[in-house]
């Protein structure tokens, strides 16, 4: 199983360049060249680490607290802001990979889903936890990718522990520690 995962990972690294990751923002300056490059690198690394070997599309929106609050209320009926929202296209389980036949025939890409990140939460949480905004943004992107791939943390037990372990492993691959 370890050998198979490593083989899938190496193949996924080759595929990473073929992922399509549009990043948009509805707040000034959020979609800076640096933020966009970081987000794309983190998504590609997370997908490779999880063994995703088909070209995928992940759409990213950078917003503020009021923007994410509105989306949260509209899409999830939760009347609150949050740090990150993930909207997976497929109902995957952890370790289950998107299949080539899930690709959009027009683009050849598997639409994994959307992520929405509050840049105000990024700044506030970076201050709260005493680390750089770059680290907080990277963490939220990894967290969201794992949700798109079926991970969850609704329990306080094995699901959450598994997701946290994957988050830390991927951040470690990126050289981003606490």
Give names to the regions the model predicted.
Residues 2-138, 146-178:
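An acidic/histidine-cluster motif and surrounding catalytic segment
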